[in-house]
Amino acid sequence: MTLVSALNYIHRTGLFGNHENKNEENLLKVSEVKNLLIVQIVQYKNSTIQFENIDIDDLNLKNEPLSVVSNSDTRILWNGPKNWLLVSTKKDLLKNISEAFRETDFAVTDLSHSRAIIELEGQNVKEVLKKGCPFNFNILEKNNSVNSTY
């Protein structure tokens, strides 16, 4: 399967904005992380299956706000009650996910072609995120996940 980025015809490389005569270390770098599997997993309200024991790439789902579980290839982010977003470099993991989560208990949706992972680098990344999201980034810790429309 060939993955095509949601930003395939939009993302351009180069220097944009007020960058002239600026120290390169002070510039914000924006890039897309490509070739990822992005899957939403939602447990139906009437499901009684215990999801904590379901193993995906040696990771288990956690139903705790802001939680993230990860290894070197896969990251599972809590997206809401019984709702997770899985991001992985293992594109063939979708078959395992579909087998692990029965259709009668879970909705599994491949979002790889409609979502993009954007990476921000630079000294003022937190300030940029604060402008577009109401979350208090001062309390954000490692392995926390935040939903935003930004």
What are these model-derived regions, one by one?
Residues 1-150:
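Basic, glycine/lysine-rich polyanion-binding surfaces/domains
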